[in-house]
Amino acid sequence: MRTLRLIGMAVIAVIMSVNFTACSDDEEEDNRPLSEKIIGHWVLTYKEGYIKDPDYPEDDEAWSHAPKDEYEYFGNFTFREDGTYSEYELDGTSNPQSIEKWTIKDNIITLIEDEHEQYELKVLEITSDKLVLEFYYKHENDGETYAKMTYKRG
């Protein structure tokens, strides 16, 4: 009886040690700065958001879906190391709409289209193959625009 209990405890110890070694952290933490992680081509996979106008509430709209052949705000991106980016249509065309500049500070990507037009996108999440960006804009008439975009590395 004592031998069976000893064998049983040994079997449990072996199972527990195998269990602990099998549960190691598969995804290592990426300590690179955001300005390095963002480099590459990102394909829009999901978008959600809304537009609210207190002057014309009947025109308010909201969306939450996979991208179609057009987009409400931002499409596919390619961010380059030299501080430039291109935005691409969702219809699969490979020609960028233009080549513009970008900067990053405190998890905020600033897209600079020209000296008068800039957009700030907050980075909510970034991994080796996933990027989640958030856009919020408060209009002068107290209206607001919000968009949350999920991308995969392309």
Range-by-range predicted roles:
Residues 9-15:
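Outer/extracellular conduits and scaffolds centered on Gram-negative outer-membrane beta-barrels
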Residues 24-99, 103-154:
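Lipid interaction determinants
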Residues 18-22:
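C-terminal motif of bacterial Sec signal peptides marking the signal peptidase cleavage site
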Residues 1-9:
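Bacterial N-terminal signal peptides that target proteins for export
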